[in-house]
Every structure is written in C-alpha cells, then in structure tokens.
C-alpha cells in the first residue's frame, strides 16, 4: 500500500524515511517548543507563556486565544518581522461594531500552505486534472490563489469560480 501524500509530504519536510504516530508527536512537540521559546524572547502577546512543554498533553494548560485577543493584539501576535509579511487578511466582525481581526502571513507561511494543499489535492487530482475552486479570490496570497497555485504545481488546471469572480 502506498503512503498517503500527506505522509510523504511530512517525511520529506522532516527528512524521515518512515513516519509513525510517535514521530508526529515528537515533531509537534519540538516545533511547539521552538516556537514557545522564540516567542518568549520577543516580548509580544505570547511573552508570558512557558518557554517549553514536557508533553503535548500540557497544551490544555495554555490559555485559549480568543477572537477579541486577535482583534486587540494583532501586531503583538506577529511571529516574524513585519518586513517578512506577504499577506494580511482582515476579517470584520459579524455585527456592525467591534474591531476587525487581522491575521498576517509570511512568504514561508504561504509556501507551506501551498505544499500542504498540494499533498491533499494530489490525492484527488494530478497532471491534466481540472479543479473548480469556489473560494475567495481577494488578491495574491488569498485562499483561492493559494489553492490555484497548488493545483498548477501538480500539473492541473484551476478553474477560478470563487467570491469576486463570475461563473
């Protein structure tokens, strides 16, 4: 049986020959601890979190980030330099009042997302495939554009039919 594309993607990203549940949990904990350590030094929104965890089970002890946190502290949540930001998504509240939420994405974030989409979409289509994308196309780095790029990279043809486009 051939491994799922997402498994092959993770193995390639992590330089592994095989992938077990234990490998995944070890990778998750290592990456989380690296992130926690770096954010503690940045003195931003996450500065009061612990510098690392002993197990993934300790995640439940961390405070949950709320929509209000995102709306009020977007710049303090940056995990990279502002110069590295490629895409900013602004999400307005469902009501008529309240601050918009802003989420920032670096070039690396967008490339990682495309790679993940390639792994997932590659299970359903490939070279010569045609895929209709009914997602927002709000400019470079938008969800629709990232999906379209993933389809192009696996040799398919994206059919753009999302918000902001006519059918």
Where are these regions (language model features)?
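Short, charged low-complexity intrinsically disordered segments located at boundaries
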Residues: 62-71, 123, 141-150
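AMP-binding/adenylate-forming
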Residues: 107-120, 130-167
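Nucleotide 5′-phosphate-binding alpha/beta core
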Residues: 1-92, 98-112, 119
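Short helix-loop-beta connector
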Residues: 125-129
């Amino acid at each position: 049986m051939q491994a799922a594309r997402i498994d092959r993607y993770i193995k390639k990203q992590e330089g592994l020959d095989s992938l077990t549940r234990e490998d995944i949990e070890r990778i998750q904990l290592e990456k989380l601890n690296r992130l926690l350590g770096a954010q503690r030094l940045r003195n931003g929104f996450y500065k009061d979190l612990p510098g690392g965890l002993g197990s993934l089970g300790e995640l439940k002890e961390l405070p949950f980030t709320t929509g209000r946190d995102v709306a009020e502290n977007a710049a303090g949540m940056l995990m990279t330099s502002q110069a590295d930001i490629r895409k900013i998504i602004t999400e307005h509240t469902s009501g008529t009042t309240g601050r918009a939420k802003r989420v920032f994405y670096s070039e690396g974030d967008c490339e990682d997302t495309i790679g993940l989409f390639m792994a997932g979409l590659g299970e359903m289509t490939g070279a010569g495939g045609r895929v209709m994308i009914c997602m927002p196309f709000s400019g470079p780095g938008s969800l629709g554009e990232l999906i379209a790029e993933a389809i192009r990279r696996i040799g398919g043809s994206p059919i753009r039919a999302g918000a902001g486009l006519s059918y």
